[in-house]
Amino acid sequence: MNTNLLKSEAERRALKALELPQYQELNLNAIKTKLSEIMGHIRDMGLFTEYTQHDISHIDGMLDIVEDIIPEQTKQAMTSVDWLMLVLCFYFHDYGMLVTREELNNKNNDSPYLLFKKNLKQKNPDTDEKDLYQDYVRVNLGERIF
């Protein structure tokens, strides 16, 4: 497997899990390559422009600091599968921020969004449409991944 995109120590540790039979079909490099393409489109619809960049560099940055956050004793106790799950969590934690043109065009046909919008407008009547939808996406980030 070409692992040139997998630069962090966490990713290198996660690769060892792919030697286990239940994970042999998983390709971290392919996942990261595809995710890199997808995450580069988060701002395409004009949303999240004031947020920090949430492309693959954001994920790489988080993976770089994880080594400093996890105590050495914990790192030694973690299995390769633990590292794999951690890396996958980092990879997909902001995936729900991606909004397609179709989704944005159909937002006013989305009952949960309309309810969210109504409730937020009651509290903050001056909130513009972009900020409303951006907040809706942010609040529902985890659910949007599935």
Protein language model features and the residues they cover:
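Alpha-helical phosphate/pyrophosphate-handling elements in metalloenzyme active cores
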Residues: F48-M85
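Divalent metal-dependent catalytic cores for phosphoryl transfer on phosphate-bearing substrates
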Residues: Q76, V81-F146
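Generic detection of long, well-ordered alpha-helical segments
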Residues: E25, I56-I59, D135-V139
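Active-site flanking loop/helix segments enriched in acidic
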Residues: S36-G61, D128-L132
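Context-gated lysine
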Residues: K7, K16, K32-K34, R43, ...
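Residue-identity detector for threonine
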Residues: T3, T33, T49-T52, T74, ...
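Basic/hydrophobic alpha-helical interface regions
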Residues: N2-L47, L63-E67
